[in-house]
């Protein structure tokens, strides 16, 4: 039987958070992620992981306090469900999701939801996997979709009106981000240095509050790229990827 651990205020300092394990360059991001989680425990934030060294976890919380531009009532929102490497194909993802579903039902929630895409995108769940458990598409913006598993006939969550814009006024390269992902902090610093070195106009907009998250101008789980005012992707970029993007756009 697999052994799982739920992070809480007592164990979070000692436990790893699955991503960026043992990589010193991401330690600042890990620290910020842990602080972010600590501040979310009061909202009912759940981080459940396999008791092993690897990326094997699910993370979710009530939609009312989830840092995403999605509005709803009495639903859980899954930020991330990730099972990587040699742990794939062993039923662990199923066990993690089934735990979250049961947890939501035990809390008398109306359902549970998550963000996917019509075609697989980095840092988003796989649509087919959630379909297997009965999740259905309840809203969409371009090729991004909100899937929900309903427990009753009450209203399902929807993307906020602001997210439907998928545009901003600024024409320079602009990146919106949160500290929900431990990889983000290093890439923000790396891209800042790269843009300065190459004399490229690059702006960062940090989403550091629930209000900012709910009113984000696009689909975002933890990162969003804009150029010429248009949303490009949700992919977290390093310097090499950003360089290719700049060349492609120019």
Sequence positions of predicted segments:
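Conserved acetyl-CoA-binding loop-helix of GNAT-fold acetyltransferases
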Residues: 83, 89-104
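Conserved GNAT acetyl-CoA-binding A-motif
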Residues: 104-120
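C-terminal "cap" of GNAT-fold acetyltransferases
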Residues: 142-165
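Conserved beta-hairpin
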Residues: 42-59, 225-230
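Conserved catalytic-core motifs of GNAT/GCN5-like acyltransferases
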Residues: 115, 131-148, 232
């Amino acid at each position: 039987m697999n052994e799982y651990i739920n992070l809480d205020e007592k164990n979070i300092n000692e436990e790893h958070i699955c991503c960026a394990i043992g990589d010193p360059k991401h330690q600042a991001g890990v620290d910020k992620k842990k602080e972010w989680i600590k501040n979310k425990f009061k909202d009912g934030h759940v981080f459940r992981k396999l008791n092993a060294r690897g990326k094997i976890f699910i993370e979710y919380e009530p939609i009312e306090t989830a840092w995403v531009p999605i509005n709803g009532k009495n639903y859980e929102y899954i930020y991330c469900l990730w099972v990587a490497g040699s742990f794939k194909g062993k039923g662990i993802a199923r066990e993690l999701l089934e735990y979250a579903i049961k947890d939501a039902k035990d809390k008398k929630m109306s359902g549970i939801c998550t963000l996917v895409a019509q075609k697989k995108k980095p840092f988003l769940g796989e649509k087919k996997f959630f379909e297997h458990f009965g999740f259905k598409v309840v809203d969409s913006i371009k090729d991004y979709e909100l899937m929900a598993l309903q427990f009753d006939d009450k209203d399902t969550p929807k993307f906020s009106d602001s997210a439907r814009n998928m545009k901003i006024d600024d024409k320079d390269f602009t990146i919106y981000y949160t500290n929900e992902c431990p990889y983000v902090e290093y890439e923000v610093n790396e891209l800042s240095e790269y843009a300065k070195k190459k004399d490229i106009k690059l702006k960062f907009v940090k989403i550091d509050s629930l209000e900012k998250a709910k009113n984000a101008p696009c689909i975002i789980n933890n990162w969003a790229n804009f150029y010429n005012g248009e949303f490009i992707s949700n992919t977290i970029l390093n310097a090499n990827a950003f360089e290719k993007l700049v060349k492609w756009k120019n």
